[in-house]
Amino acid sequence: MSRRDQTPAGDEFDGFAQRVSRVSALADPIRRALYHFVAHQPGAVSRDQAAAGLEIPRHTAKFHLDKLVDEGLLVPEFKRLSGRTGPGAGRPAKLYRRVRKEVNVTLPRRRYDLAGHVLADTLERIQAGTPLEEAIEQAAENAATIVLDSWPPTESSDVDRITGVLARLGYEPRPEGRAGEGVQLSNCPFQQLSDDHPGVICPMNSRFIDAVSRRLDCTDVHPTSVDRGTGCCVALRGD
């Protein structure tokens, strides 16, 4: 699978509550110190190493290390520290490493990872000889395809399908006017980037939402560029 096939649909599968729980687990000072200790070691850490490093009882280190595993912040592995194998080698020790997967909690919702992947994909296509505008279109289409493959919509109407997908990406769609008249996207998932680089990010965002709409074969609603104000530069308008 190429990197272009790995544009993240996001960590919504974990759920907002679970991500908050993971971050909240670090509110405990001992747990937070253990996490940082493990993260800064060159290899996996044993309970004895962690206890000695923080000068705390071993049973305290064990309790908090296992809590960090339960929250998905550390991953365990088992290894015989003596280096011996076979009968008499003893039981393998439980070791701990930091997980590679990042945990993001942003309020309002931000998706800088998605913007980064679209922009990186665009640059790779340009380096391969694709013209700029075509490269942006292809990268946006690729991102939309991967998002929809990850989150196949089940809603029946065009509006419900596209707003369901955009809601999961953090756009916060809200109906405006009379029923079927349109939908405002009240949050920009790329807010800081679009504030600093509106001439780059807003066109990219518009192409991405257009691509989502095309992939969903929406005919009753279409994306339209608007003055973004405090929200998104795109709104959905009914026919």
Question: What does each model-identified segment do?
Answer:
Residues R84-G88, G177, T224-G229:
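A short beta-turn/loop motif at secondary-structure boundaries
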Residues K101-T106, F190-S194, D239:
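Short, charged/polar, Gly/Pro-enriched secondary-structure boundary elements
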Residues P92-Y96, E181, T230-V234:
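Short beta-strand micro-motifs in enzyme catalytic cores
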Residues Y112-H117, D121-P223:
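Mid-protein regulatory/catalytic core that forms ligand/cofactor-binding pockets
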Residues L81-G83, V103, Y171:
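Short beta-turn/strand-loop junction motif enriched in small, turn-promoting residues
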Residues Q184, T219-D239:
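Short terminal or interdomain "cap/linker" segment that borders an active site or interface and mediates
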